[in-house]
A protein has these predicted regions:
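Transmembrane-helix signature of polytopic, membrane-embedded enzymes
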Residues: 10, 108-130, 148-149, 368-371
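Loop-to-helix entry region of an early transmembrane alpha helix in multi-pass inner-membrane enzymes
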Residues: 71-78, 83-103, 137, 141, ...
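Short hydrophobic/aromatic helix or loop-helix immediately within or flanking a transmembrane segment
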Residues: 41-46, 60-86, 99, 145, ...
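Membrane-interface alpha helices of multi-pass inner-membrane proteins
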Residues: 124-125, 157, 184-199, 209-213, ...
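Membrane-interface anchor segments at the N-terminal boundary of transmembrane helices
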Residues: 88, 92, 99, 300-301, ...
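Transmembrane-helix motifs of polytopic, lipid-linked glycan transferases
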Residues: 92-116, 153, 355-359
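Membrane-proximal stem/loop segments at transmembrane-domain junctions that anchor or position
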Residues: 241, 249-322
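Short helix- or helix-capping micro-motifs
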Residues: 15-18, 124-132, 136, 156, ...
Length: 424
C-alpha cells in the first residue's frame, strides 16, 4: 500500500470515528423534526411489510402536510430494522449513516485523486473527514448523508466515461474502450436513478449531464444515460399513478416547495420554518382547498406560483437575484434558527472552504476537471434558484465539489504523473 493510500485509509477511519462521536456523544436525546418523523414512520411501514405508507399508529404533529415521499431513504431505514415508534434517532441509524458518510469520504478522495493526483486525493479525504457539515448530518434521520454518497458514486462512475481526449504536453492520455464506456454509462445512469429515488432533486442532474454528453458529440451515450435513468425511476412512477390517481414522477412535495420559493412573501432562502408569514399563507391556501388531498393540491401550488410570476416579473427577477446570493453566501433567514455554535461550525467552515475552492477550480479548469461532480453541483445550484436555497440542499453535493476543488491546491503539479481521464 502506497503512502498516499495509507493516509486516505486513515482519513476514512477518522471520518467514521468523528461522525459516530458527534452522533452518539454529543447529539443525543434530541427531538425529531417533522421530516425525521415522516421518514422513520414510512420506514416502520416498510419494515412491517405494509409498503411506503404512513402507519395508522403514527400521530400527526404540527401543521405540516404529509406528502408522498421518495422511497429510497425510508427503504434504507427499514433495512436497519426500524419497526417501532421512536422519539429520537436510533443509535444504529446514526452508526450506519456514519459508515455511509465514511464511504463518502472515500469517494471524495477518489474524485480528488482523479482531478489532482495522490496529493489531491489525500487532501480531499482529510478535509472531508472532519468537515463539520458532513460530520453533523449522519446524526439526523434525514436523507442527506445517503444521497451525498449515492450522488458522489454516480459522479465518480460517470467521470470514467472517456471517448475522446485532447493531447496535452506532458500528460498521459487514457481512453476507455467504447464498449466499456457504454457499460459505465449504464452503471452511472442506474446510480443516478437510485439518487433520484433518494432525493428527487437529482432529476435536474439528468439534463445537465445529457447536455454535456451531446456537446462532447456523444449523443448515443446521452440517450442511453437518459433512458436508463428514467427506466430506473419508472416502476415507482407507475406505482404513484396507481396510488394517487395522477402522474407523480417521484414525490408529491414539488408543488408546495416551488410555491414556497416563488411567492410574494418569499425571502429568497429557507423554508416556511424561517418565514412565519409564508407559513400562515400556506395554511390559508390549504383551507381554501380543504377537500383535496396533499397530492391533489400539488398542481394548484404550481398554478398559483406561476400566476404570480406572470403578474410580477420584476419582483420575481429580484427574488431570483436574492436566491443566487443566498445560494453562495450562508446568511439567509434560516441560519438564524440555529445556535451560534452551530452557525460558526457550519457556515464558518463553508466560508473558509470557499476561497481555496474557487482558486482550485480555476487551476483545474484546463486540466482534469471533475466535470461530472461540477455538473452535479451546477444542477444543485439550479434547483436552489428554481425552488429556494437552504443549507440542507447545499451540503450533500456543493460542499463535496468545493472540497475536491480546494484539494487541487495541494497537488504539486497538474496531474502529470498519474494520467488524466476526462469526465463524461
Amino acid at each position: 500500500m502506497t503512502r498516499s493510500r495509507r493516509w486516505i485509509v486513515a482519513a476514512i477511519a477518522v471520518g467514521f470515528a468523528v461522525r459516530v462521536a458527534f452522533a452518539l456523544g454529543y447529539w443525543v436525546e434530541q427531538p425529531l423534526t417533522h421530516d425525521e418523523r415522516e421518514y422513520l414512520a414510512l420506514a416502520r411501514s416498510i419494515a412491517r411489510g405494509d409498503g411506503v405508507v404512513y402507519p395508522a399508529d403514527e400521530p400527526v404533529t404540527g401543521t405540516a402536510q404529509r406528502f408522498g415521499r421518495a422511497p429510497g431513504y425510508p427503504v434504507f431505514l427499514a433495512m436497519l430494522h426500524v419497526t417501532q415508534p421512536v422519539d429520537t434517532v436510533p443509535a444504529r441509524v446514526k452508526i450506519a449513516q456514519s459508515a455511509v458518510g465514511a464511504i463518502g469520504v472515500w469517494l471524495i478522495a477518489l474524485i480528488g485523486g482523479r482531478a489532482a493526483g495522490p496529493r489531491g486525493a489525500v487532501a480531499a479525504a482529510g478535509i472531508a473527514a472532519v468537515y463539520p457539515p458532513l460530520v453533523f448530518m449522519p446524526a439526523y434521520a434525514l436523507s442527506e448523508t445517503l444521497y451525498c454518497t449515492v450522488a458522489l458514486a454516480a459522479a465518480w462512475v460517470l467521470g470514467t466515461v472517456t471517448l475522446t481526449l485532447s493531447e496535452r504536453p506532458g500528460s498521459v492520455t487514457v481512453t476507455v474502450p467504447n464498449r466499456k464506456s457504454v457499460t459505465v454509462t449504464v452503471l452511472g445512469a442506474g446510480l443516478t436513478g437510485i439518487g433520484i429515488l433518494v432525493r428527487p432533486a437529482m432529476l435536474f442532474f439528468v439534463p445537465f449531464a445529457a447536455a454535456w454528453m451531446v456537446w462532447k458529440r456523444e449523443t448515443r451515450h446521452a440517450v442511453i444515460f437518459v433512458l436508463v435513468t428514467l427506466a430506473s425511476v419508472a416502476p415507482w412512477t407507475v406505482r404513484n399513478a396507481r396510488v394517487h390517481g395522477r402522474f407523480v414522477l417521484v414525490a408529491s412535495e414539488g408543488g408546495v416547495t416551488f410555491w414556497t420559493g416563488n411567492n410574494p412573501l418569499a425571502r429568497g432562502e429557507g423554508d416556511m420554518a424561517a418565514n412565519p408569514e409564508l407559513k400562515r399563507a400556506e395554511l390559508e391556501f390549504r383551507n381554501r382547498h380543504a377537500d383535496l388531498t396533499p397530492e391533489q393540491r400539488e398542481p394548484l401550488y404550481y398554478r398559483e406560483a406561476f400566476a404570480w410570476i406572470r403578474r410580477h416579473p420584476a419582483q420575481w427577477t429580484a427574488l431570483l437575484a436574492r436566491k443566487v446570493f443566498y445560494t453562495i453566501v450562508p446568511l439567509g433567514p434560516s441560519y438564524t434558527l440555529h445556535s451560534k455554535k452551530y452557525l460558526v461550525a457550519s457556515a464558518g467552515a463553508y466560508l473558509l472552504l470557499l476561497p481555496p475552492a474557487l482558486a482550485g477550480a480555476w487551476r483545474l479548469r484546463r486540466g482534469c476537471a471533475p466535470v461530472a461532480l461540477w455538473l452535479l453541483a451546477a444542477s444543485t445550484v439550479f434547483v436552489s434558484v428554481v425552488f429556494f436555497p437552504q443549507e440542507r440542499f447545499r451540503i450533500p453535493v456543493i460542499d463535496p465539489a468545493l472540497i475536491v476543488s480546494a484539494a487541487a491546491l495541494a497537488a504539486a503539479r497538474s496531474h502529470e504523473h498519474t494520467g488524466c481521464r476526462s469526465n463524461l
